């Protein structure tokens, strides 16, 4: 084809921008960002279409935008970082189908569903080799090569001599349920026409990777019967010559699936280091609601090891760079805002759009953020099912009994990143790298699995332990009950694949090769943030309650919560507003949040005088001088290390604020606004003394349960000082982070004057929100009218009230039915007094009784309580106790045991 003929098969606009090349305008082989046809994902795949959409909107190429979309674009343009999407052209599915058409008869033979077998990995390896060898032998047509040349020369003229990214994009897999992520080829930093052309061919070849074939074969309802002719496309993008940091932005918390958050995973160099899972990246989580209010939205940060970086080649990172954040919290906040706005934009443009998985990079020299990819998050599900996980020997607070603890192999700093679950299995440990490891992996896996089956039969599954997983491992991963990796993060191949396939997994598990030995039988507890592994086969059960058709509770049933790290997961498992359950919290335990910081607030405030404070204990006979000096220096060093560049007080305030915000943020989002009752610290003196530095400031009491605690403790001379620092943290959460769904609760109020004085201190700290109190002392009941006057609401603390009414040990076994009956009469008296004297006074209850006794929960409703709170595991039993009926008279509860037995509504299935 001569130049005149070649240029006849393309079209440019009046400003010299390529519209299409090759084929025809109706069925082009190549389209550019300046052609609206590139927005057709059936032509170019969702990945390419969405990238082009961002480019067109940021560059003013779309004149027909809704006012909301234009507002979002304007907000993106006003960010501290300049937001761009790189120019690109796309090789369409038309071009791919023309290339593949002559090969289809042979390809269909290789991909015959009568030959492929999900249980036979070798069948997919053979199909991969046969298909790819066939494609490699076929040259591109002259016409196609020239069309690519036209597109490349146009792209290079607009941005000369920069590297290009050549990415596969599969129209059939870029939806909200199925993802082609990681299954096909991506070639980064390609220079010149020949490298780009060869990279396009490599992408075509990768269409038949065995991981992709296995994935498609296992879902015929999505991909059809003919695997040979599935749609496929390739995008060719400009790249920045220099990238400082890169990674992923998810517009939902991927661990809990909560849509109210943005998750950032970034490292030095190109984003391949994060996406592949090869590097443990820095990770930030921001709440969207504060970001929308232009307030501090940072909820959590975890420093990654960042062992290596990738700039086209892999390099070892310096210890200095590994030990520090790859970017500031302020930059991460800007990234989160940009990601949130882009998610808003995609939902505005497509009402069926789900939350977004974005890849981005930053060039600090040009103050530019480059959005390199966007796809749907495929793992977001919120079923009307409540699951309760029970492991023998583990209580509701996550504490192990002696028997279970004796078998603990590893409780890792790694991350549970798959489906929450408990499982047991025999370890298959496979480590290595390079072509030889890839070649032998499947064979070794099958050999080990056969040995396990021969020994244990089919009732014991296998748990894969490896450095990281890849799409080519998927046929083997299909045969596991869990996957454990020593590298990677929450959003690389392992967790994405495991979530899509309903499996638990843990990533970045240090020590796994040492403690999880090949061939050993283990139990994996994959619930919550941190994975735990136990030797042997422990009994467990998973209880599933179907919620569809259940009647709602007549009053709100809220939660008792105390762990910021699991709050988002608890919310997503328990928040069902249509049933009036899981609606915020009637008790957030401050002391458990503060204990995460490990240090007494007075030690933080007195960090410069710790030695003299501890030396006072010498005169009291509580320490030797040597112990006092050594302890003071140890506490001071801890505070210095944790505070870093901040002052100790600023560090403490910010860290405590993050813990509080971590609890309340899941319940204050774009779509959720539920009250969170935060109880001010109720440390007993012995508990407070256990914190670092606490012995210097806490007295030794014979009975801390009845000693210096609650409201009275805040009013001592030095206690007012540390209450001030605690209130400063709370004020930051309310005023600087914007969480106005918080209510404050004061514990252990002995007199109305105590309540008034605490209220004054709270107001002086800049906090102006409702102030409740705990009704947990007998005097709170007998003098209720006086306490109603000094409080904006209250929660009955049934644990302490029961203990103090009868002088009982509330955790002992000597509580009788008569005690409960008397307690009920006291609660009835309080409710009646409220109804008579101050009917608008909101009264709830939190304590063990409704959590452990559904009958008591029902009684509370009948007695006229406004709400009550239970532990998350007790939520559904409490609901069933309250409504007293279920669909068709059945509770619709299924229990799965460790032995593989299934019980439905108490009957063995």
Map each language-model feature to its residues:
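Acidic, glycine-rich flexible loop/linker segments
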Residues: 1, 13, 103, 107, ...
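N-terminal beta-alpha lobe that positions the nucleotide/phosphoryl donor
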Residues: 1-235, 244, 323-330, 335, ...
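Conserved phosphate/anionic-ligand binding catalytic regions in large, soluble enzymes, centered on
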Residues: 17-48, 53, 67-68, 77-99, ...
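Beta-sheet entry/capping signal
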Residues: 82-90, 163-164, 233, 247, ...
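Generic beta-strand/beta-sheet core signal
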Residues: 86, 92, 167-169, 237, ...
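Conserved alpha/beta-domain cores
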Residues: 172-180, 243, 339, 550-909
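Extended active-site and interfacial segments that coordinate phosphate-rich ligands
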Residues: 181-214, 242-312, 371-413, 480-486, ...
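Conserved catalytic alpha/beta cores of large enzymes that bind or transform nucleotide phosphates
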Residues: 262-365, 461, 612-669, 733
């Amino acid at each position: 084809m001569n130049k005149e003929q070649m240029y006849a098969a393309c079209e440019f606009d009046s400003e010299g921008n390529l519209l299409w090349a090759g084929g025809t305008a109706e069925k082009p082989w190549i389209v550019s960002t300046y052609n609206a046809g590139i927005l057709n994902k059936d032509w170019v795949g969702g990945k390419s279409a969405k990238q082009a959409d961002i480019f067109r909107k940021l560059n003013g190429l779309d004149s027909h935008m809704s006012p909301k979309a234009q507002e979002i674009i304007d907000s993106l343009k006003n960010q501290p970082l300049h937001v761009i999407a790189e120019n690109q052209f796309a090789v369409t599915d038309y071009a791919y189908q023309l290339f593949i058409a002559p090969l289809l008869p042979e390809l269909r033979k290789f991909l015959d569903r009568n030959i492929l077998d999900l249980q036979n990995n070798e069948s997919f390896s053979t199909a991969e080799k046969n298909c790819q060898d066939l494609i490699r032998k076929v040259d591109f047509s002259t016409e196609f090569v020239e069309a690519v040349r036209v597109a490349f020369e146009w792209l290079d003229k607009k941005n000369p001599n920069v590297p290009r990214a050549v990415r596969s994009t599969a129209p059939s897999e870029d939806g909200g349920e199925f993802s082609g992520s990681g299954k096909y080829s991506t070639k980064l930093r390609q220079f010149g026409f020949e490298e780009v052309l060869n990279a396009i061919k490599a992408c075509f070849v990768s269409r038949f990777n065995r991981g992709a074939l296995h994935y498609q074969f296992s879902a015929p309802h999505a991909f059809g019967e003919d695997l040979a002719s599935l749609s496929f496309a390739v995008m060719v993008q400009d790249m920045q010559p220099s990238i400082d940091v890169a990674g992923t932005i998810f517009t939902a918390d991927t661990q809990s699936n909560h849509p109210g958050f943005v998750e950032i995973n970034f490292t030095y160099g190109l984003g391949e280091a994060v996406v592949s899972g090869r590097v443990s990246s820095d990770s930030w989580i921001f709440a969207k609601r504060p970001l929308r209010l232009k307030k501090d939205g940072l909820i959590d940060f975890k420093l990654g090891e960042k062992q290596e970086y990738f700039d086209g080649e892999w390099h070892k990172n310096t210890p200095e760079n590994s030990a520090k954040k790859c970017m500031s919290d302020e930059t991460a906040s800007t990234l989160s805002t940009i990601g949130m706005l882009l998610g808003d934009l995609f939902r505005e443009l497509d009402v069926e759009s789900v939350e977004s998985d974005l890849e981005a990079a930053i060039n600090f020299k040009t103050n530019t953020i480059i959005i390199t990819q966007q796809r749907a998050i495929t793992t977001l599900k919120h079923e009307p099912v409540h699951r309760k996980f029970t492991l023998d020997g583990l209580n509701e607070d996550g504490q192990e009994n002696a028997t279970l603890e004796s078998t603990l192999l590893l409780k890792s700093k790694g991350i549970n990143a798959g489906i929450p679950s408990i499982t047991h299995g025999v370890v298959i440990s496979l480590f290595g790298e390079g072509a030889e490891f890839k070649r032998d992996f499947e064979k070794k896996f099958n050999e080990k699995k056969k040995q396990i089956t021969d020994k244990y039969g089919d009732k014991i599954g296998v748990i894969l332990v490896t450095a990281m997983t890849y799409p080519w491992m998927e046929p083997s991963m299909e045969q596991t009950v869990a996957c454990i990796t020593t590298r990677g993060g929450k959003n690389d191949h392992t967790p994405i694949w495991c979530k899509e396939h309903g499996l638990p997994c843990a990533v970045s598990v240090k020590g796994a090769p040492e403690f999880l030995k090949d061939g050993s039988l283990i139990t994996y507890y994959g619930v919550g943030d941190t994975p735990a592994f136990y030797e042997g086969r422990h009994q467990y059960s998973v209880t599933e309650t179907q919620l569809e058709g259940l009647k709602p509770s007549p009053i709100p049933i809220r939660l008792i919560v105390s762990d910021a790290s699991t709050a988002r997961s608890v919310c997503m498992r328990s928040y069902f507003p249509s049933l009036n359950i899981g609606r915020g919290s009637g008790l957030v335990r401050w002391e458990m949040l503060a204990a995460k910081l490990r240090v007494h607030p007075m030690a933080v405030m007195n960090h410069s005088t710790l030695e003299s404070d501890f030396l006072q204990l010498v005169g009291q006979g509580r320490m030797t001088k040597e112990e006092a000096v050594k302890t003071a220096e140890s506490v001071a060093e801890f505070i210095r290390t944790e505070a870093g560049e901040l002052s100790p007080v600023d560090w403490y305030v910010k860290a405590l604020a993050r813990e509080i915000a971590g609890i309340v943020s899941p319940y204050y989002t774009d779509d959720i606004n539920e009250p969170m009752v935060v109880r001010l610290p109720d440390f007993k003196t012995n508990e407070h003394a256990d914190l670092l530095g606490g012995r210097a400031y806490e007295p030794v009491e014979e009975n801390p349960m009845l000693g210096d605690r609650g409201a009275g403790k805040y009013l001592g001379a030095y206690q007012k000082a540390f209450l001030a620092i605690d209130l400063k943290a709370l004020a930051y959460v309310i005023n600087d982070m914007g969480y106005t769904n918080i209510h404050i609760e004061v514990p252990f109020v002995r007199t109305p004057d105590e309540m008034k004085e605490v209220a004054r201190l709270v107001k002086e700290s800049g906090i102006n929100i409702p102030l409740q109190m705990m009704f947990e002392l007998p005097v709170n009941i007998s003098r209720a009218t006086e306490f109603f006057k000094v409080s904006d609401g209250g929660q009955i603390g049934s644990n302490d009230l029961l203990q103090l009414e009868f002088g009982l040990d509330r955790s002992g076994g000597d509580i009788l039915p008569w005690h409960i009956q008397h307690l009920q009469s006291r609660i009835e008296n309080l409710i009646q007094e409220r109804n008579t004297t101050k009917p608008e006074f909101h009264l709830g209850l939190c304590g063990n009784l409704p959590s452990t006794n559904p009958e008591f929960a029902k009684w509370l409703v009948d007695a006229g309580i406004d709400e009550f709170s239970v532990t998350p595991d007790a939520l559904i039993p409490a609901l069933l106790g309250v409504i007293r009926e279920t669909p068709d008279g059945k509770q619709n509860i299924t229990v799965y045991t460790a032995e593989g037995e299934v019980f439905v509504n108490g009957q063995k299935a």
